[in-house]
Amino acid sequence: MKDLLKFLKAQTKTEEFDAIKIALASPDMIRSWSFGEVKKPETINYRTFKPERDGLFCARIFGPVKDYECLCGKYKRLKHRGVICEKCGVEVTQTKVRRERMGHIELASPTAHIWFLKSLPSRIGLLLDMPLRDIERVLYFESYVVIEGGMTNLERQQILTEEQYLDALEEFGDEFDAKMGAEAIQALLKSMDLEQECETLREELNETNSETKRKKLTKRIKLLEAFVQSGNKPEWMILTVLPVLPPDLRPLVPLDGGRFATSDLNDLYRRVINRNNRLKRLLDLAAPDIIVRNEKRMLQEAVDALLDNGRRGRAITGSNKRPLKSLADMIKGKQGRFRQNLLGKRVDYSGRSVITVGPYLRLHQCGLPKKMALELFKPFIYGKLELRGLATTIKAAKKMVEREEAVVWDILDEVIREHPVLLNRAPTLHRLGIQAFEPVLIEGKAIQLHPLVCAAYNADFDGDQMAVHVPLTLEAQLEARALMMSTNNILSPANGEPIIVPSQDVVLGLYYMTRDCVNAKGEGMVLTGPKEAERIYRAGLASLHARVKVRITEYEKDENGEFVAHTSLKDTTVGRAILWMIVPKGLPFSIVNQALGKKAISKMLNTCYRILGLKPTVIFADQTMYTGFAYAARSGASVGIDDMVIPEKKHEIISEAEAEVAEIQEQFQSGLVTAGERYNKVIDIWAAANDRVSKAMMDNLQTETVINRDGQEEQQVSFNSIYMMADSGARGSAAQIRQLAGMRGLMAKPDGSIIETPITANFREGLNVLQYFISTHGARKGLADTALKTANSGYLTRRLVDVAQDLVVTEDDCGTHEGILMTPVIEGGDVKEPLRDRVLGRVTAEDVLKPGTADILVPRNTLLHEQWCDLLEANSVDAVKVRSVVSCDTDFGVCAHCYGRDLARGHIINKGEAIGVIAAQSIGEPGTQLTMRTFHIGGAASRAAAESSIQVKNKGSIKLSNVKSVVNSSGKLVITSRNTELKLIDEFGRTKESYKVPYGAVMAKGDGEQVAGGETVANWDPHTMPVITEVSGFIRFTDMIDGQTITRQTDELTGLSSLVVLDSAERTTGGKDLRPALKIVDAQGNDVLIPGTDMPAQYFLPGKAIVQLEDGVQISSGDTLARIPQESGGTKDITGGLPRVADLFEARRPKEPAILAEIAGIVSFGKETKGKRRLVITPVDGSDPYEEMIPKWRQLNVFEGERVERGDVISDGPEAPHDILRLRGVHAVTRYIVNEVQDVYRLQGVKINDKHIEVIVRQMLRKATIESAGSSDFLEGEQVEYSRVKIANRELEANGKVGATFSRDLLGITKASLATESFISAASFQETTRVLTEAAVAGKRDELRGLKENVIVGRLIPAGTGYAYHQDRMRRRAAGEQPATPQVTAEDASASLAELLNAGLGGSDNE
């Protein structure tokens, strides 16, 4: 018996491995895998259902059909195992060997492997340096190829047609060798000397100068080197032996009625074997060449179809006209092996059911239907029954459970106690989509869910279903309880704010409870405490809203963390006093002494978590929920049609708007405004009217007049149910109320343009047919949009997860001093995001100094928690340099300090945390809330774009940065720099507002001056760009010849004349090379120099410039010499929402990107071509100038002779991220992508922490291009992993050698995922064939570093609790001892888990 057990154990041994290598299989290797040759195309005998001998299902080759029984039945039972039956030749063993034993087919003629032929770029083509078309013509027997030219004038690899071949044969006889078909290609590949070829190419590479040639050579060298290094032989790309898949992986199943269901592969194999056998026969018969050739071609096509059907020519179809599924189709796509079976599996011990509300549950509980629990916990119940001796055998236990005896239910209760289960709701968009709960047995068939976790699951109770999973092992239960329990997931990993926040009814209940009311019953009472408040409320002596005085005891923590009590009399209401009873000790009373809306409640829970920690917060959240439900029920808030009060003013507002519209219409008919202007104006009028109506309506709703104690009238906040729901944040918004009681307003057509007739009615009045019809547009578009959005958002999430999946925190501190400078986000006059929100939970990269002093406020490497942030705010620090993932120096991972706080736990992040996946989920999860539309700017928006002044909102002082200016004749500052910024600083030194100031703006206030709110500080003409002189003197025209370079125009209305410079296209030949300019000279006619330089003041004028001054006029600095009319931007579309986020992460180049200066220097314009200008930048140090051709229609921001810095904008437009990286560096591109992505999310009110976007940016910057190789093994122009270059350079520098220089590359997320080092991860993402082909040729090793690869091969992932296990394995391997037990034991797991958890939970108190 012992032997038997030993034998069974040996059957299930697991392989320990550290890497997976993929390479080409040599014919010998294929034969060594094989257990025999498949000679016949037969499958099974249709009468006996026994496999045919030597056929595709042959038992002799692949193993027995029944366990331990040979085919003819001579040997049965286990005692004969290992015997080979002499009659039928079948080995007696388990039948599962039919899943792993392979066969082979000896091909009568070699055939090319289609992957290496047709997967672009063609590997065979690249290796032989022949065009794919030619190779295909040889392979499919259309032409000959010369293999050995001998002494003739024929080149090797020359292609000959049939006629040319015959001619050559006549001329040279057998001096030369030419063949056709795969044999020819095989011979060519065989005769290649790879190393010799490599040498030749390298020499050629050094000599050539042409860029395209270099690229091609580098590609070939790389491929050749890959072959040399991996030990693959090129001729192995041509198959001479074809492996046959084990039969149980391509099953043949008899259906009833004598038919068979079969895998398509069997058809494809049969076809190959048939053609191969026929070819053998033809060769034996020495058949005519043309017949043999045809058969060989058909064999090649059959093998192509088997490997990858449809890659070449038409796909081979089966009986039902659908293409057969080939081997390649089995692994790729959503239904392929990778995504269907390796990354996603069906799980045992799981069930699903509809969910319903469990308002009486605790936060860590869920209601599990008894029937379901009985089914899920069956094995545990059987075990317990047997242990207790209630059942003698498992079979008896089974019977008891099936009969559902009384004792079974008692046992079930025991089994379930403290055994957490996992609840999951699809779609699982972030990690909170699976959480653990303790089950509570309930009657009925629906799972009960705690209302507060609905937000995390995005669940509602309109028929949603959820799945239950049972963690079986001790370790799994431990992890579920310690890491996944709903009580441990109070904060959202995306932004660190509480995600367990009351909503809807609970909010309404708490809001109703904490409202106050004038002259309510019991007003003015003085009560001894919350208990008495509750008593008098229950007794009906006071209303919930009565304003009373109550004695309140507050607790505060002192230095030692002990609670100190303060008691005082507070003005409050009865309801607030009652609510105070559930607030935990340690929170101030002020937190509930207000009307609590959703925001306030969220803040309350957040404060509670930060001050008191996890446990009190959980209890408090539960209590708020119970209280909220109870008082929402008592409030009796309901909606009736009379609650929707329509404002009286509505009628007159609408008639006013109609009158205005009529007036515009008249103007249009008399030709004063264009159709576009009329449309925009009409829309503006209606939009304004709509706002007025809704304002009137809200004013009407939000207050009501009541009689107070003294009998006077008083205004108070309304108790209108609809208003209360919106005001508390429970449900609905002002916009929705507007549609109920105001007017519905403007509607959009399906294409996004606005219909100019608004719906003036609201839902209370009811819509007429036309209005109803217009509204249906919007409603339907909404539904269609939602469906599209979900798919797009899901795809974005998948790409993000794929690019970031292998990023894990691997060390504590990388020691870098690099970081990102964080400043508050200010748009126009508003602080969109204060500094504290941006730096909270980050680690400082440098000491933060107290502004204006050298005192250190916060030392370097400090994790900024709430108290530090308060300190920063108190000292009004407005910029902090923090560590960032992007600048982290860790190889293949990130250090904890560069990441900072784990947002979901509130302490510094643990090692082994999978930050990449968390980042991807945090960005992808809100994707469905983003819009899909592109915004058409028109109407109000287009006019706002043509701003002409800056008006500040707050009082403070002005601070200008990046400024060059001159003072004009009236003493005002005129800006002459391009990217000037104006900031408004308040008295505490904090930046309140920030504006861009254009060139030529006239400042009303200077730098450092005080301004009051509402003051205008700068003016400019939005329609023209001025040319401003920096010096005073007299104007001298140069090259301004009337009729050749300029023309004089007179304005009809004013009679003033001006000169207009002609565009070079409009000039006569004589004027083509002239450069019109205005020179400034002094009274003697000498050139005036620009201050600070030795350059004469000379201003070149571009085409279309208007000069209103005459030659010789005196001017003073700051005057406008000429004006260049600006084309008004027209209506540009802004891509918004999801498509914009996808564009940013895919690093797509915008259509007409901004043109940036490649080097610093002086701008001048060279010779123009037909449609382009030549921009020349000459460096100041006299090195080579840089030239670039720019299309004429691009508006330039620079004048001739102006100095630019590297990365300055020369022509406006959306900036391309690649340019920013190249010219301004990694931090600039990070800042750009983070800010742009945040803008999109901020617009939708979604909060995501910056560091998640930075994590993705780090992954986009994974690759670097080698510029010069130094002493390294890299090739110039090769793209390599950034970490690899860093490691190589470190080693070289340690040995005193020259490292490689490189430039960082920015890859879009799809590209970056495919360029990952792990071929398994890339193959399971997209383009499986290409990835695998490339990997096989290079003989790649996959080190299984990322999470995805480990999931695919079925190991623990190297993150979370698996991180410790992997670290331990690496340590053991380094010590050179193999572990005695490959499996991880329960003790190890629980120990390492405990260590991890202590790190996690211990860190929360002291930050």
UniProtKB/Swiss-Prot annotation:
Chain positions recorded as Zn(2+) 1 binding sites: C70, C72, C85, C88
Family annotation (Pfam families): RNA_pol_Rpb1_1, RNA_pol_Rpb1_2, RNA_pol_Rpb1_3, RNA_pol_Rpb1_4, RNA_pol_Rpb1_5
Gene Ontology biological process terms from the UniProt entry: DNA-templated transcription
Binding site for Zn(2+) 2: C814, C888, C895, C898
EC identifiers of the protein: 2.7.7.6
InterPro entries with a match to the protein in the record: DNA-dir_RpoC_beta_prime, DNA-dir_RpoC_beta_prime_bact, RNA_pol_asu, RNA_pol_N, RNA_pol_Rpb1_1, RNA_pol_Rpb1_3, RNA_pol_Rpb1_3_sf, RNA_pol_Rpb1_4
Domain of life: Bacteria
Signal peptide as annotated in the record: none
UniProt catalytic activity: RNA(n) + a ribonucleoside 5'-triphosphate = RNA(n+1) + diphosphate
Keywords: DNA-directed RNA polymerase, Magnesium, Metal-binding, Nucleotidyltransferase, Transcription, Transferase, Zinc
CC cofactor: Mg(2+); Zn(2+)
An example molecular function term from Gene Ontology annotations: DNA binding
Note accompanying the cofactor annotation: Binds 1 Mg(2+) ion per subunit.
Gene3D superfamilies in the cross-refs: 1.10.132.30, 1.10.150.390, 1.10.1790.20, 1.10.40.90, 2.40.40.20, 2.40.50.100, RNA polymerase II, clamp domain, RNA polymerase Rpb1, domain 3
Keyword field contains Transcription: yes
Any one GO CC term of the record: DNA-directed RNA polymerase complex
Binding-site residues, Mg(2+): D460, D462, D464
Record has Zinc as a keyword: yes
Entry's family note: Belongs to the RNA polymerase beta' chain family.
Protein's job: DNA-dependent RNA polymerase catalyzes the transcription of DNA into RNA using the four ribonucleoside triphosphates as substrates. Chromosomal supercoiling density is controlled by a combination of RNA polymerase and DNA gyrase activity; negative supercoiling increases upstream of transcribed regions while it decreases downstream, DNA gyrase introduces negative supercoils into underwound DNA.
Subunit structure, as described in the record: The RNAP catalytic core consists of 2 alpha, 1 beta, 1 beta' and 1 omega subunit. When a sigma factor is associated with the core the holoenzyme is formed, which can initiate transcription.
HAMAP family per record: RNApol_bact_RpoC (MF_01322)
Stated name of the protein: DNA-directed RNA polymerase subunit beta'
Organism lineage: Bacteria, Pseudomonadati, Pseudomonadota, Gammaproteobacteria, Enterobacterales
